[in-house]
A protein has these predicted regions:
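A glycine/threonine-rich phosphate-anchoring loop and its flanking beta-alpha core
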Residues: 30-128
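C-terminal charged capping/lid subdomain of soluble metabolic enzymes
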Residues: 93, 209-297
């Protein structure tokens, strides 16, 4: 439908946030035209990325698109957006702690290519959000500016690295697993960043608990060292909660057995090494699952 309506036009402007932006990017990519976005919420990091998620046959897939030509925003509009949408944006950005750790883990353990320029851009944008976290929680101008800038930088970092590594790790795999669950049941799907925020809490705890795991395994020392640079899950939960985001999967209406299934199987979502893959390789989830369920369900 979008492609049909865009025929004959050389430019499409999406007015909105995630879904409309994705549709415009994909449609104009296929037609060889250009697009822009007038953002109405700082809710996700796909504004400037070169890929777009699509729902195909009841599954979530990521396909090539192109980045927008222009990004327009009125910060009075962004600040007035529903708090949960700003919370979703915060969930997507604070997830970058885990994304970068997962990427570095894969680089050091598996030799995956690492792009320092993309990682440095993401770290700097993340630091600005941490510095303005109080204003973000209050949906204040400075905080929303920092958050929106970080969301744009995240897209640029993906373009620079040539993939979504700077912006997507195990927490996104958890989100995508749950998205498929909601899709197949025909139920309303919670905002992407809301689910990613929950996945971030799980990933942070998975990293932090490694130092107390008695079992020795390849990569443990590296993972524990990476965990030292990560914030405490309680801090991230406080930020998300202040914006109205859930901090337990039960708040999404997901059954406990589905969350348990997610913990054991979401690594299959994508062939990408993360802390979740580390747990699978070393059979760590069997001893961690009950603990994670008690904390986050």
């Amino acid at each position: 439908l979008a492609e049909e309506r865009a025929k004959g036009y050389g430019y499409v402007l999406a007015v909105g946030s995630g879904t409309l932006n994705d549709i415009a990017k994909y449609t104009t990519f296929r037609q060889g035209t250009e697009c822009g976005v007038y953002a109405t919420a700082a809710s996700m990091d796909g504004f400037t990325s070169g890929v777009t998620p699509l729902i195909c046959g009841g599954n979530k897939v990521t396909v090539n698109a192109h980045t927008v030509r222009h990004v327009l925003a009125d910060f009075s509009v962004l600040c007035a957006a529903p708090r949960i949408m700003t919370g979703a944006g915060a969930g997507d950005i604070f997830a970058k702690y885990c994304c970068l750790a997962d990427w570095r883990l894969s680089h050091l353990l598996k030799g995956e290519a690492w792009n320092e320029e993309a990682a440095s851009l993401m770290r700097a944008a993340l630091a600005q959000c941490v510095e303005n976290v109080g204003s973000i929680a209050a949906c204040g101008r400075e905080g929303v500016e920092a958050l929106f800038a970080a969301l744009l930088v995240s897209g640029y970092a993906m373009v620079i690295s040539g993939n979504s590594r700077p912006a997507s790790g195990a927490e996104h795999h958890m989100s995508h697993f749950l998205e498929v669950y909601f899709l197949r049941r025909g139920e309303h799907i919670p905002l992407h960043g809301v689910k990613v925020g929950l996945g971030t809490l799980v990933s942070l705890h998975m990293y932090k608990r490694l130092k107390d795991v008695p079992q020795d395994f390849a990569g443990k020392e590296i993972a524990v060292k990476l965990a030292e640079a990560l914030p405490e899950p309680a801090w991230a939960a406080g930020v998300l909660s202040s914006l109205g985001c859930p901090t337990r999967f039960s708040q999404l209406g997901v059954p406990e057995d589905v969350v348990r299934d997610m913990l054991f199987n979401c690594w299959k979502i994508r062939d990408r090494y993360t802390v979740m893959t580390l747990y699978r390789e070393n059979d760590l989830m069997r001893s961690a699952a009950d603990e994670l369920i008690s904390l986050f369900y």
